[in-house]
Structure formats: C-alpha cells, structure tokens
Design a protein with these regions (language model features):
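Hydrophobic beta-strand anchors of alpha/beta hydrolase catalytic cores
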Residues: 109-110, 142, 192
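A short beta-strand-turn-helix
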Residues: 78-108
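N-terminal targeting signals for export/organelle localization
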Residues: 1-85
Length: 223
C-alpha cells in the first residue's frame, strides 16, 4: 500500500525529488577539471536524467485518459466499480513505444506496480512463474501499469527492476501525477483490475494475489 499498514492474519499484503611559472600547471589542470564537470552536467541535463535505458521519463511522458474514471476502491467486497466500463488509457511503455489499455481490448487483467513497493517486488515473480508454468487463458490479455515512479525511492528505475525479473508483460508507464492510477480508482500496491469481454469491471483487488486466485479470476473472464 502506498501508506504502510499493519498486516493482520488473513489480510492481503500490500504497500498504500592566472599566475605564471610553476604555479600555472596546477591552475590549468584545475580549470580543465572544472570544464569537464560543467560539460558532464550539461550532457546530463540534455538527457533529462534518464538512466533507465529506455524508460519513458514520468515527468515528460503524458498519460491520456478518456471515459469515466472508476470510483475509488474503498471496500473490495462491495466495489461500486463492478459493472462500470473501463476508461481508456494511452501512453508509452517501458521502452517508449505507444501502448493503450481500454474497454475494447476484450477480457483483460491489469496489474498495478510501484517499483519501491516490497509487496510488488514479491508479486512480480509470482506472475512471471505463472506465465511460464500455466500461461494466460486464450483470449485474455495481461497488461501492467508502472505507477508512482519516484527516482528518490528504492529500486529505481522500474524498467531495470522488471528486466531483472524477466518481466515480459506490456507495461504502461504512468506520468508524474499518477493519472493512470487515479483513473482506475486505485491507491494501494500491488493492485489488480479484471475486465470482461464487454469492457466492464468484474473485480478489483489490492495486495499480493496468490497464483491460484489469479488463475481463477482470469479463467472466469476468458471468452
């Protein structure tokens, strides 16, 4: 959950910015070093500080939202978003390529991840193993939203973390204001949004999700 919580038994685990002579040589060396530092700083600024090897920088990559945002999830057992149409999200993936998530995609499972969230770090290998051993049901799409990105927090950038984990799921990069997260009405990590073939929300879930439970839901929404 973005805000740390105390976990009780049975609850899902989640996490809720110029002299002469001999004295001249040291001076010239000092000037040269200063010049190199300035040049390096200019290059870093020009590159936008992107050290992710392809991560779309959150401060510059916008996320487009169309349609009605889902209401905030307050009670998963009585989720008012169930039956509501999924809003469309557009933006870029981890390599900067265009990507979209929307109600016209057919059955879809969306997983929300924050790179600094320890429960997300525990959930990613579960999904990776599930995909390798079981695989998604035919006709069901799996996508992810990398959100709440913060260069000052651990495990940054998310692209490097996900690459280390063998993550191959198409992943939309949220913007600096976490607009995609807000459109899905979520605030805890990891999070899941399951959508049926008509583009309507079937279930939302927060916290680590066992592979067996994930499999049960994605099979229920399969065409």
């Amino acid at each position: 959950m973005t805000t740390p919580t105390t976990r009780s038994r049975g609850m899902p685990r989640r996490t809720t910015p110029v002299p002469s002579g001999r004295g001249q040589t040291p001076l010239l060396v000092g000037i040269g070093v200063l010049g190199l530092v300035i040049v390096a700083a200019i290059v870093a600024i020009a590159l936008g500080g992107n050290t992710s090897g392809g991560l779309a920088e959150p401060a510059r990559a916008g996320v487009g939202v169309s349609g009605t945002a889902l209401p905030a999830l307050t009670d998963p057992a009585a989720d008012t978003a169930v039956g509501q149409g999924l809003p469309s999200l557009t933006g870029t993936d981890l390599s900067g390529e265009p990507i979209s998530i929307g109600p016209g995609d057919g059955p879809v499972a969306i997983v929300l991840l924050a790179h600094w969230c320890s429960h997300c770090q525990a959930e990613v290998p579960v999904i990776v193993d599930y995909l390798a051993s079981t695989g998604m049901p035919e006709g069901v799409r799996l996508v992810a939203l990398s959100t709440s990105i913060d260069a000052a927090r651990p495990n940054y950038p998310p692209s490097s973390w996900l690459e280390r984990e063998g993550w191959t799921v198409p992943t939309l990069v949220d913007d600096a204001s976490s607009r995609g997260l807000a459109a899905l009405g979520m605030s805890s990590f990891p999070g899941f949004v399951f959508v049926d073939g008509d583009g309507r929300v079937v279930q939302r879930y927060t916290g680590e999700m066992p592979a067996e439970a994930f499999d049960q839901v994605v099979r229920a929404i399969a065409p």
